[in-house]
Amino acid sequence: MSRYRGPRLKKIRRLGALPGLTRKTPKSGSNLKKKFHSGKKEQYRIRLQEKQKLRFHYGLTERQLLRYVHIAGKAKKSTGQVLLQLLEMRLDNIVFRLGMASTIPGARQLVNHRHILVNGRIVDIPSFRCKPRDIITTKDNQRSKRLVQNSIASSDPGKLPKHLTVDTLQYKGLVQKILDRKWVGLKINELLVVEY
């Protein structure tokens, strides 16, 4: 199954807020969730919705998500917590959380087009796993800096998670440590994803 490129507001109406997918919000009067889906929710549907939230927020394919679940299952810690840590430490997500891009697909495009450096080297793989003490910067040319400048100016510095620091003047970010569960930018029950 390929990456989702369809209407984003439909997914937000169905699944709730997904800040990584888009900044848009549906109109307050158009609550289709209540209109069509009233009544008792089945357990399967609840688990499926949680999995879809995770997929659409981080922009993953089904196969990529399965791979991350298998890696998290082999870890000694809680599988759900390790899964979220793996997803949050992806390069495209770190670029998004630093405010260098307005959405995760936008951050993925910056990485694919070779505008982002990790520890002074160009990395063009969005799924690159960042480690603590990695330094994320933009390329030292005018075009790369202009692309990131607009996003940094419009981002809210209060939403920056505690495991990241950003220097807006030099377009530089630092991964200080691995993320805690409470700083994940998505309201999700990760145990339901693992059960699915």
Curated annotation (Swiss-Prot):
Ranges for domain S4 RNA-binding: 89-150
Cellular component terms per the entry's GO annotation: chloroplast; small ribosomal subunit
Protein's UniProt keywords contain Chloroplast: yes
A biological process from GO: ribosomal small subunit biogenesis
InterPro entries listed in its UniProt record: Ribosomal_uS4, Ribosomal_uS4_bac-type, Ribosomal_uS4_CS, Ribosomal_uS4_N, S4_RNA-bd, S4_RNA-bd_sf
Localization: Plastid, Chloroplast
Main location: plastid
Keywords, sorted A to Z: Chloroplast, Plastid, Ribonucleoprotein, Ribosomal protein, RNA-binding, rRNA-binding
Region ranges (Disordered): 17-36
A molecular-function term among this protein's GO annotations: rRNA binding
Recorded family membership: Belongs to the universal ribosomal protein uS4 family.
PANTHER family (alphabetical): 30S 40S RIBOSOMAL PROTEIN, SMALL RIBOSOMAL SUBUNIT PROTEIN US4M
Subunit structure of this chain's protein: Part of the 30S ribosomal subunit. Contacts protein S5. The interaction surface between S4 and S5 is involved in control of translational fidelity.
Entries under HAMAP family matching the protein: Ribosomal_uS4_B
Free-text function comment from the UniProt entry: One of the primary rRNA binding proteins, it binds directly to 16S rRNA where it nucleates assembly of the body of the 30S subunit. With S5 and S12 plays an important role in translational accuracy.
Protein name per the record: Small ribosomal subunit protein uS4c
Provenance organism: Tragus racemosus
